Amino acid sequence: MLGGFSMARALVPAVLLLLPALALGQAAPEAKADSAPAAAAALDPGTAAKPAGPAAPAGVVDPRTWGTRETEWKSHRELAGHVFIPSFIIQEPFSQTSFGLKFGFGSGSATGPSLVWTGNPSDPLAPGPDKDYPFNALGFGVNVTARILEWLSARLLIGGDAYLGSGRDSILVIGTQVKAAADLGVMASFPVGEHFRLAAAFDVTYGPAFNVLVAEGIASAIRDGTANVDVLNRTSTFTWIPGLLGAWAPFPFLGATLNLQFVHPSTTETGTSSFSQNGWSLAGAVDFDLAPLVPAVPFGVIVAYKLLGPLGSTGVTRTDNLDFGLFYTGRKDLALGLEFDLRWFHIQSELASTGTTVLFTMRYYF
């Protein structure tokens, strides 16, 4: 027993001495394995593992993909996965912030009576058979819209257009007409389910118009026997426009928009009293976007129609617009395209006219 106890007492220190060695022996392969990348990094610093950067906060989109189809960022003009394509004759029922420009040029013809020289100083020009008078047209516009709340927005539109007679007879009859207008409006909108959105809008428009009436000026000069004749007719119009707007997106590639408005313009002519008119406006649009179906073809088309009709005995003059648009749809924050507008209207409220205009349209959404 004493011998066994002496042997155990001798083995305990030996075991205690072996434990650190065994621990070092097990750790050696791991250290050797871990040292391989370190050695490689020492030989080639480019292969060294780089520390991972901090993860992007939730909800933050890579700036390189802002507005593109690859992101989950939802545009304020998006409904049920469909990003609506704008048209200059349609008001969208979306609360959004955007800046837009449009510029267009075109031509057309107006139908009116021909001028017959009578030789009578009291009535030097008399109307003859109707004929067509060609004209050229120019137009521009700036659109600024601000999203105040999720359901409330305000907008400011500034624009103008001009019609110029083309040719000697057209210059005499049509002359030159220049119009400018500023539109200030507010809109309250709200979603109805997933596929619909409705809005109520109220706009106030003010704009002057200048008409250079060459034929009337010549007739007045002969009739009055004086060259001091004012050939410039000036008017100013103040218009109230309340309306209801709606949008429907049954599929991500298809959308429809509808506008119904009441129009009440009050016009003041130079040297005469004011007069008021009433009218109504109905406009609709259907747009088709290829991007959700074929991402390699980021283009869309829109077809829109707008009718301005008289209301009551003192109604406005009827105007029809038929609009076709081709737009780039690769970015949700950009609407860029060409619009072709066919318009039936009256120049100077007397000459029935038909005109075709090509417009360049750009709108950026923030």
Describe the role of every protein-language-model region:
Residues 8-16:
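Sec-dependent signal peptide recognition
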Residues 29-33, 37-251, 256-265, 273-328, ...:
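Transmembrane beta-barrel domains of Gram-negative outer membranes and organellar outer membranes
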Residues 1-8:
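N-terminal secretory signal peptides that target proteins for export/translocation
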Residues 20-22:
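N-terminal signal peptide c-region/cleavage motif recognized by signal peptidases
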